[in-house]
Amino acid sequence: MIILGIHSHPGGHNAAASLLINGSLVASVEEERMSRIKGDSAYPAGAVAEVLSLGGLRAQEVDVVAMAGLACDKPQGLLADRVCHVIEHQLAHAASAYYASPFGDDRVGVLTLDGEGDASSGSAWVGARGCLRNVAYLPRHNSIGLLYAAVTRHLGFIAGRHEGKVLGLAAFGSPKPFLSRLAAHPHPGDALKDLCGDLPREDIAAGLQAFAEQQVCAWVQQQMAAMGVSKLALAGDVFANVKLNQRIQALPGVQSLYVHPNMGDGGLASGAAFAVHARLQGGLRPELAPVYLGTRIDRANALQALQKFDVAFEEPVNLAQAVAQLLAQGQVIARADGKMEYGPRALGNRTVMAAAHDPHINQWLNQRLARTEFMPFAPVILQEYASAYFPAWVAGQLAARYMTLTYDASELAKQHIPAAVHVDGTARPQVLGRADNPGYHDILTAYQGLTGIPSVINTSFNMHEEPIVRTAEEAIRTFQRAGLDALVLGPFLVRASAQ
């Protein structure tokens, strides 16, 4: 059965399309990557065309269209006459996490939290034997996501986009003053201006983060006890908060945690498709879904783009060793190769890399990429060394493969990769095994051989307020605009010094 999942509705964000073939997720792309409009909410015609192309299909071959959200747009064009099922917002989030998780036949607690969707701000489900059963919905007026967005806006940032900046800022403040005010007010969002008063914005951010952690962790524990589960699958924008996820993983009774890599509304398209498949087939056994599901950069289209832009390039016999040598020399290198990542995190295929031993590299990168961040850039680390740098990490913690939570850094990490460690002593690593991304792993292995350090900075390959690059042409343009030292484009190496 071929199911096309679509997320698109008026006033929404992160429209997307996903292709499910016989229960397996084979392609997923957000419309912003096609239109180059950050968080694009328009009907995802470009993303629909792209996932069908990636699947080698025509629109007429789609059996069912799965739309996410009760207020969704209708399928357009050649899809207008397809059978269409509409999936409620929180169910789509829950399905995205449950059916893409590695938990198989296990009993799982599936939790969703976001700003709002279809009049609710979260939900709890039991996942068992391939089916989801609802346990609870959270009303809109209790939304942690909306409160976080309101404070983000109050602090002068863009709500729905810059919550990560507030999270980074929180580490510089004292939580107590604002936390006590939030805890004492039954509906803090209604009196936000008065509650914030003249407090420094660092203290406001710190208090907000502490309040969110307290409220969400208490709710998670309550739901785990009610459901009798020790394994959790999470989705929804609130779970983009990596410090919150660290707290959840450390809760008593949490045996295993899976945070959906595309936890925000960009993941609703795949969730809707999963939910419809389970509805029509009487269930769907969860299986860990791939994270590289988008447009592919390969030798052919990389070469075509390089020739179009008249860019000087080389094709090293040992590309990984060549890149590692440049990194060891302090150069900053972008990598655009293979399939684009699914979700907001760069995981090696649309990535900017830099040595993390220089604490000033964050300032350099922020200037070149026109970013303003309060949290340092995240590291990627070879799996076999992860526990030495992040002692709480143990094999099998999937959330760390997708950079969806922070860890307390060891003294070794603070010495070797200070640029990746925040002022509060945490870092958000991508723990990389070779099977996850062989080419990326080879670069890191070669770098470790040269420097003795198994980790580098890994940040997304895009300019500030722009989507991550998708195509080879976009990679060349962004490389040139950012003034980076080198670009890995498929099997080719472009050096700025050679231009």
Give the role of each language-model region.
Residues 1-3:
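Entry/capping segment at the start of metal-dependent catalytic domains
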Residues 5, 9-31, 35-38, 78-182, ...:
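Flexible beta->alpha loop and helix N-cap segments adjacent to enzyme active/binding sites
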Residues 33-57, 216:
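N-terminal phosphate-binding loop and adjacent alpha-helix
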Residues 50-87, 95-97:
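Short beta-strand-loop/turn "lid" adjacent to the catalytic site in phosphate-handling enzymes
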Residues 58-70, 227-237, 333-334:
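Short glycine-rich phosphate-binding loop at a beta-alpha junction
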Residues 180-200:
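A mobile "lid/hinge" subdomain adjacent to the ATP/sugar-phosphate binding pocket shared
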Residues 198-214, 433, 437:
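Short acidic-aromatic active-site loops that bind/stabilize oxyanions
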Residues 207-232:
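Phosphate/ATP-binding catalytic cores across multiple sugar-kinase/actin-like superfamilies
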